[in-house]
Amino acid sequence: MAKMQAKVQADERDDGLREKMISVNRVTKVVKGGRILGFAALTVVGDGDGRIGMGKGKAKEVPVAVQKAMEQARRNMFKVPLKNGTLQHEVHGKHGASAVLLAPAKDGTGVIAGGPMRAVFDVMGVQNVVAKSHGSTNPYNLVRATLDGLRKQSTPGDIAAKRGKSVEDILG
């Protein structure tokens, strides 16, 4: 089974969402009469202000697979609380054999992240972050692990509500 890694393609549509294609894989189904070829596309969509979604699409042709993936990513968007263009706090994410460490960074640091993680932060609008991946480097698992970590973010307001205190008490 051949595998094609497509370059990360970016594109901004009229609705203001940023789209990036992370990978396109050629997949094969073996049946009695031979092989059936198809394509699987992995994409992320974001608004540049903390909203992010991931989609995976499969089809017989590449453009259809990418379109399906983009539509699924738009449907699966969720909001991540950002703080001045970076994350709220350090967080770990995991999916399958992939694990990621996401940490906030000072202004001017930039996005220090590899491959699929960089695409996620670019469409999300994060300007300063340090990210490290451990384990499997499968693009699908890395994106899912990154999104898992981002979902675990807590704002000072969330923490204050859990503890029954005010935000000023939490921040010191």
UniProtKB/Swiss-Prot annotation:
- BP-aspect Gene Ontology terms: translation
A GO MF label: rRNA binding
Write down the superkingdom of origin. Answer: Bacteria
Arranged from A to Z, the UniProt key words for this protein are: Ribonucleoprotein, Ribosomal protein, RNA-binding, rRNA-binding
Q: Which GO terms describe its cellular component?
A: small ribosomal subunit
HAMAP family, sorted = Ribosomal_uS5_B
Under the heading NCBIfam families, the entry gives: rpsE_bact
The entry describes its oligomerization and partners as: Part of the 30S ribosomal subunit. Contacts proteins S4 and S8.
- UniProt free text on domains: The N-terminal domain interacts with the head of the 30S subunit; the C-terminal domain interacts with the body and contacts protein S4. The interaction surface between S4 and S5 is involved in control of translational fidelity.
Q: Which PANTHER family match?
A: MITOCHONDRIAL RIBOSOMAL PROTEIN S5
What is the name listed in the Swiss-Prot or TrEMBL entry for this protein? Small ribosomal subunit protein uS5
* The species this protein was found in: Paraburkholderia xenovorans (strain LB400)
The encoding gene is rpsE
